[in-house]
């Protein structure tokens, strides 16, 4: 079964415009975040070097001004009881593109395919302050959908962010 990413990639051979991808994704009737996770290649733990989409129920949600229950993250490093991840949903779409472009020099190769991994030094990147979050394994509610480098330009525009109690923008 082809994933939503496969369908878009198949119809966009040779076209790299982020605006074109964004319009294509918005024109589609995309399944919800949970459906994407269920239909894609999912793992029980986050896969480092690629993006991951998963369901999450924050431990201190009652104290947060807003939070995302379906984060789209780059997991960076293990942390007590979980991991640190960069959630792209905390950035406006234009900033997501700029952030993704800024990561181009951190790739393991220039193929931008299933073999490509990102090596991010999150302590010195402009976009990190707003997006770095500590995720606890015992608050993860779904498997982790692994999103490869070739799917990332599409994934940042999928309307799967689910903020509760407000929005970061």
Q: What residue ranges belong to the model's regions?
A:
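Basic/aromatic-rich interaction segments and small domains that mediate binding to polyanionic partners
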Residues: 64-103
């Amino acid at each position: 079964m082809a994933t939503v990413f496969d369908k878009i990639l198949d119809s966009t051979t040779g076209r790299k415009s982020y605006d074109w991808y964004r319009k294509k994704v918005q024109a589609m009737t995309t399944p919800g975040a949970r459906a994407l996770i269920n239909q894609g290649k999912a793992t029980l733990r986050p896969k480092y070097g690629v993006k991951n989409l998963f369901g999450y129920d924050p431990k201190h949600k009652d104290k947060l001004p807003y939070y995302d229950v379906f984060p789209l993250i780059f997991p960076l490093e293990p942390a007590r009881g979980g991991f640190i991840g960069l959630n792209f949903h905390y950035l406006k779409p234009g900033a997501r593109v700029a952030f993704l472009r800024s990561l181009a020099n951190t790739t393991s190769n220039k193929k931008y395919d299933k073999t490509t991994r990102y090596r991010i030094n999150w302590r010195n990147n402009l976009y990190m302050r707003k997006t770095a979050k500590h995720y606890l394994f015992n608050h993860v509610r779904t498997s982790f959908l692994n999103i490869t480098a070739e799917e990332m330009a599409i994934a940042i525009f999928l309307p799967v962010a689910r903020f509760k109690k407000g929005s970061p923008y």
